[in-house]
Amino acid sequence: MRIIIVGCGKVGSALAEQLSAEGHELTLVDLSERRLEELTNRLDLTAVAGSGTSYQVLLEAGVQDTDLVIAVTTHDEINLLSCLTARKASGCHAIARVRDPQYVADLGFIRDELGISM
């Protein structure tokens, strides 16, 4: 499966390690070139420096050919916007890490109308 992970913090790094071990084709997107370099030195994956909310960055990451986008930054809004942009760009599946109870209350709308899993 071709997967784009937005965010290379603790969650994104752990997710990349697990999915890489399972044999998935990964592309990581993060603002930190240092974090991306650390992961590309350890894992077989592609890295793109930039914001996951940027349509151009997602295109560079190969969103048009990806199966799944998982956004796991520390910011709920960035995760939701990254997933929404990816869904509109390619129709791929999208999962956003969301911690704010406000968004959890809107889960049905976000899932059914925006097509984003949380």
Where would I find each of the regions flagged by the language model?
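Cytosolic regulatory regions of ion transport systems
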Residues: 1-118
